[in-house]
Amino acid sequence: MRVRKRKGAEKHLANNPHYVILNPEDAKGRWHDVFGNDRPIHIEVGSGKGGFITGMALKNPDINYIGIDIQLSVLSYALDKVLASEVPNVKLLRVDGSSLTNYFEDGEVDMMYLNFSDPWPKTKHEKRRLTYKDFLDTYKRILPEHGEIHFKTDNRGLFEYSLASFSQYGMTLRQIWLDLHASNYEGNVMTEYEEKFSNKGQVIYRVEANF
């Protein structure tokens, strides 16, 4: 998700250290201390404007959520949603998805969400896709044994690529939805992007996979 640069975004994040962890490397291995409890930790890589992570936190107060995005302006909009919702079980990080092992110990994260990641359609950009094998190496380290990834996209090419990447990595594809919104799946929390494009008739794909 690309958004216009937001004036004051950096200051906005800096002024809310309760929600925005400015030095996440210091939290490595002690995220339960950061949250002040021993509840499960779920992360969303590429959290966009925060609709999903906030919605999940409201729905599941017994789970700790961490929204991760590298874009400063985007993360500032996510912070707006977190502040408006007053959810106590959300933290936000401005870091790159390829560097997660710098901020989480092995097995410290209980579940991961990848929602509407950049498809990087050109073959020469394959290594930038968040479901490329090098990213899977990183995810496997920070997740527990048989850790889960829940992946959603509206891009058929990226979905097919990701299914193949998961399978080739040796992951188990537990459930697959080829048209999520036409299915009987309950409990879906939509991102802003998902809501916008599904209303235009765009098909949404989803898979749950574990290592």
UniProtKB/Swiss-Prot annotation:
Q: Name one GO molecular function term.
A: tRNA (guanine(46)-N7)-methyltransferase activity
Q: Which InterPro entries is this protein grouped with?
A: SAM-dependent_MTases_sf (IPR029063), tRNA_(Gua-N-7)_MeTrfase_Trmb (IPR003358), tRNA_methyltr_TrmB_bact (IPR055361)
Q: Entry's SUPFAM superfamilies?
A: S-adenosyl-L-methionine-dependent methyltransferases (SSF53335)
Keywords in alphabetical order, please.
Answer: Methyltransferase, S-adenosyl-L-methionine, Transferase, tRNA processing
In its keyword annotation, does this UniProt entry include Methyltransferase? yes
Enzyme Commission number:
2.1.1.33
Provide the active-site residues from the annotation: 118
Going by the entry's taxonomy, the superkingdom of the source organism is recorded as Bacteria
What residues does substrate bind to? 122, 154, 191-194
Q: Which Gene3D superfamilies match?
A: Vaccinia Virus protein VP39
**Binding residue positions for S-adenosyl-L-methionine:** 44, 69, 96, 118
* Region named Interaction with RNA: 124-129
Pathway linked to the protein: tRNA modification; N(7)-methylguanine-tRNA biosynthesis
PROSITE patterns in alphabetical order: SAM_MT_TRMB (PS51625)
Spell out the coiled coil positions from the record: none
Query: One GO CC term of this entry?
Result: tRNA methyltransferase complex
Q: Which reaction does it catalyse?
A: guanosine(46) in tRNA + S-adenosyl-L-methionine = N(7)-methylguanosine(46) in tRNA + S-adenosyl-L-homocysteine
Family of the protein in this entry: Belongs to the class I-like SAM-binding methyltransferase superfamily. TrmB family.
What job does the chain carry out?
A: Catalyzes the formation of N(7)-methylguanine at position 46 (m7G46) in tRNA.
Q: HAMAP family in the record, alphabetically?
A: tRNA_methyltr_TrmB (MF_01057)
The protein in question is named tRNA (guanine-N(7)-)-methyltransferase
Gene that produces this protein: trmB
